[in-house]
Amino acid sequence: MSKIVGSDKVKRGMAEMQKGGVIMDVVNAEQAKIAEAAGAVAVMALERVPSDIRAAGGVARMADPRIVEEVMNAVSIPVMAKGRIGHITEARVLEAMGVDYIDESEVLTPADEEFHLKKDEFTVPFVCGCRDLGEAARRIGEGAAMLRTKGEPGTGNIVEAVRHLRKVNAQVRKLTVMNDDEIMTEAKLLGAPYEVLKEIKALGKLPVVNFAAGGVATPADAALMMELGADGVFVGSGIFKSESPEKFAKAIVQATTHYQDYKLIGELSKELGAAMKGLDINKLSLEERMQERGW
């Protein structure tokens, strides 16, 4: 029996519907309900938030399907779930469960260090991380319907997400003034599919939404990423590792929506309690940096 494959247009359209919103990591039904009540446009169901995955070490895998099912049954908003890079079976299991999106995620331990998933062979849309236009174009070429910055997950440190978003946007701007000969050379330099780069030039932007992720910990962090051109925000550990998850969740959603209302952001940031404890990126070894996973 042949597989039913969703079209790029449909998958990208589904992701476009989340634009301007916040997607929150949750580990149980209770957290999912808090996220939905705060105004999250979707939730990411996983066994442990990135900061706990980082602290535990070892091999991080797809969440217990029971956790994913509990979250799916608890909320009416879309539910995403993470699978390991290159792990075909984890992705097929999540697709069979009926999740709305799969995140082929560097937060989990990669199953394949050479190949990412062929995402255009799935019906369910995929979201993937990127640090630059080469990574973005390769994931789009494989069928990703949504992108996000890799940032540095589980650190509460926004600096890498800022770096990645600025780099992608700068490379897109550069591409828009190139002729076809130059685009072919750029494709070679970036290791990117030529046709994807031509599509980006024609549109003047990425053909899929690109959210900020990896280090968002405060309302101001979320607003900053929107200011820099993100289409929305993922918050991993920043909500439920803070002192007041409900307050942080609501404040981050409002700051994302009203990211240029600086007076409001100041008000939203008052008396929230302590944000999650942050990590200095410079003190992480190359092996400890999740953003280095994938290619």
Swiss-Prot record:
D-ribose 5-phosphate binds at residues 25, 154, 215, 236-237. Belongs to the PdxS/SNZ family. The keyword Cell membrane does not apply. D-glyceraldehyde 3-phosphate binds at residue 166. One of its GO terms (biological process) is pyridoxal phosphate biosynthetic process. It is an enzyme of class 4 (lyase). It comes from Macrococcus caseolyticus (strain JCSC5402) (Macrococcoides caseolyticum). This is Pyridoxal 5'-phosphate synthase subunit PdxS. Pathway: Cofactor biosynthesis; pyridoxal 5'-phosphate biosynthesis. It comes from the Bacteria.
